[in-house]
């Protein structure tokens, strides 16, 4: 389920940003290269709970293919254990959109997953918004809701390495910085049909 949601978010983000910039739809071509990984080891940090208890977050770079275009993104990933929420921020160039930033918050409550996605690009600033926010709620199984024991590497892999969109990534653990996961400036609500 998390892989599907992550894939949906990346595709929705790319489609939304392309739509905001007046870009036409492009067919996404599957990656012909294999995903390779480099993971920096951190002693004692194996699960998302360990990440929270150590006051650390994952920081890295990844080569991502969106709408047939390959770009390098920088990302940060954190698990807020008391709130049962994963936080992801990534930044990179996106074709005609220029620099793009996204903050994705996945909050788990029982069998409900609430995903809040904030998106920012140079093109949106011309529309009077610093950020656009989209919120989506879905039902998940109770086992999917228990994420604290999930291995850190699996957590960010399921966020990024879905459907062959990521070719390679490199990560390390760094001190947690909460300001990275808060949008600054004017936030506009984006509505879409169900």
UniProtKB/Swiss-Prot annotation:
Q: This chain belongs to which protein, by name? A: Uncharacterized protein AF_1001
Q: Does the keyword Signal apply?
A: yes
Superkingdom of this entry's organism?
A: Archaea
Q: Does the keyword Signal apply?
A: yes
Q: Which UniProt keywords apply?
A: Signal
Which interval of the chain is the signal sequence?
A: 1-24
| Organism per entry | Archaeoglobus fulgidus (strain ATCC 49558 / DSM 4304 / JCM 9628 / NBRC 100126 / VC-16)
